[in-house]
Amino acid sequence: MKHPKILSILLLALLISAGISWDQFTHPDISSEGAVSLPEKEIHIPATAETPPAPALQAKYACVMDSISGRTLYGKDMDMKAPMASTTKIMTAILVLESGRIEETVCASSYAASMPKVHLGMQKGYQYHLKDLLYSLMLESHNDSAVAIAEHMSGSVQEFAEQMNQKAAELGMANTHFVTPNGLDAEDHYSTASDMCRLAAYAIQNREFCALIQAKSHHFSTIDGKHNYSVSNKDAFLSYYEGALGIKTGFTGKAGYCFVGAARRNDTTLTSCVLACGWPPNKSYKWTDTKKLMDYGFTNYAPLVMPVQDLTALRIPVEDGKSSFVSCQQPDEIHTISSRSEAITVIYEIPEKLYAPVHADTPVGNISFYINDTLYCKENIFPSESIEKSVFSDTIRNVLHLWMENFG
């Protein structure tokens, strides 16, 4: 124990000569001098308007959603499962477009040719360009084209439906299940108004999809040139509503009239869905309801960037670190949409000090964003750099430990 004693005595002499007290090491702490904290740990922006009245709708199920943030602006039984008729074909089209196979040749089967109206009128053995069948599918909602596409893409309708369901799961469509590629009434074929809004928001990110649904007409023929076809866009929403991007209508005896729509004005893009929106002769209900939903969204909501203080100006004390302070990375902007009737609250959770080692990829705190007291999202706060633990500090503690063992 001779050498440890000598080291301890030398250390003690060094500390005394440097004017450093024993208590600074037996009860380690760092000075808060030089630390910079946030001006406010909580920011509250009050509402400045009354809650807008809900739109009066004919549809049993409805939803309008901000396509960028995915925030629901209004819903009417929007998570109730219901048949969605030919709005199903949105998913069918997206799977084809994302496959990169639109130049392939499709041969119609007898099963595809047997599909009821609305249909293209294909016969067994007819061959088409896959791209042409997409126009048939989305402009005039042909059921035979949907089946021919599904069989070509996956070998069977059943296998294609599995791909549809896999994609739905990826998109967070938790209350959706596909059985057919065309939306004809089938057991266990259903979705919800909110899920279909999510699908529409995803679909309109695809430029080819947008070009497809906005085409006024398309002319094509079978591969051999013997049979010619002309299809025109049946989506009246395109001319009915300012800023309309269109998307897809639907009707079956079980589903009633349905429509999934999208519209853009300035920096806001909304998607909407109405299901079970009347039965014959009330064909126009889907248009008036969709207009009400879109008007509700565009009139009462506007884009918002959540307020965040400058975290790069922070100086958080670091205990036992090679650096005494660390700042924080500025998080990415949080974009959403909000109404003047909604209060915004931002709460910061940041420690008063940190203990080395500090890792730049490990969060040291978080920011919670609330809309009307409901948590909207939570973002992690990361340090601006990694801070290693001080080796000198460890050495001193080891020597002090020996001192305590021998003289304490």
Which residues are covered by each model-predicted region?
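N-terminal hydrophobic or amphipathic segments with adjacent small-residue motifs
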Residues: 13, 64, 115, 119, ...
